[in-house]
């Protein structure tokens, strides 16, 4: 068995190692594609605290732009409303966590990815590369305009609980160890570089 790691593999590796930004990314992708059951049923990761935050913060929000992209027959459509709220809640958490990393490491030269502080909820716009664009939604109850990258206390609780769940999930750790043992970013085979 030989595995070349892709973007998703690396994000899962980071999540298993306890990177909160990677954990948020893994959950966001799972929510977007209607695969939260992989986390809950497959790995036993409890998402109740996140679901509670999502339902409290976005109860009346249609979560425009956070729809679940699923295949017919593979997904219980009754889960869509909750999954969309989870998708939005974890996306905002992810943007905040990534913002912390970007600010902590200016050498990454990723300041252009910092957009939460460029949003104007009153006008319903965001400034990107000097041009103003309309927002699809202005419902961001967990964003503090004075410090948009600060996690709320409830978000911090969710993040810490999820971090512990990912780091202490033996099945996930076993799968990630397998990726480390049997995989790499590239392979040289028959004199050819494979990546």
Locate the predicted segments by residue.
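Feature recognizes metal-dependent phosphohydrolase scaffolds
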Residues: 1-195
């Amino acid at each position: 068995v030989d595995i070349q790691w892709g973007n998703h593999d690396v994000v899962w590796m980071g999540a298993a190692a306890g990177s909160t930004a990677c954990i948020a990314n893994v959950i966001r992708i799972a929510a977007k594609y209607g695969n939260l059951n992989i986390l809950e049923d497959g790995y036993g990761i409890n998402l109740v605290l996140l679901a509670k935050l999502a339902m409290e913060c976005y109860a009346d929000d249609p979560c425009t732009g956070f729809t679940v992209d699923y295949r017919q027959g593979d997904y219980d459509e009754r889960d869509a409303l909750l999954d969309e709220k989870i998708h939005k809640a974890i996306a905002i958490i992810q943007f905040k966590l990534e913002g912390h990393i970007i600010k902590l490491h200016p050498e990454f030269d990723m300041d252009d990815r910092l957009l939460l502080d460029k949003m104007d909820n009153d006008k319903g716009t965001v400034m990107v590369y000097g041009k103003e664009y309309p927002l699809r939604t202005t419902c961001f109850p967990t964003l503090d305009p004075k410090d948009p990258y600060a996690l709320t206390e409830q978000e911090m609780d969710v993040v810490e609980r999820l971090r512990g769940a990912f780091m202490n999930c033996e099945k996930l750790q076993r799968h990630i160890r397998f990726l480390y043992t049997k995989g790499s970013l590239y392979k040289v085979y028959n004199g050819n570089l494979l990546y």
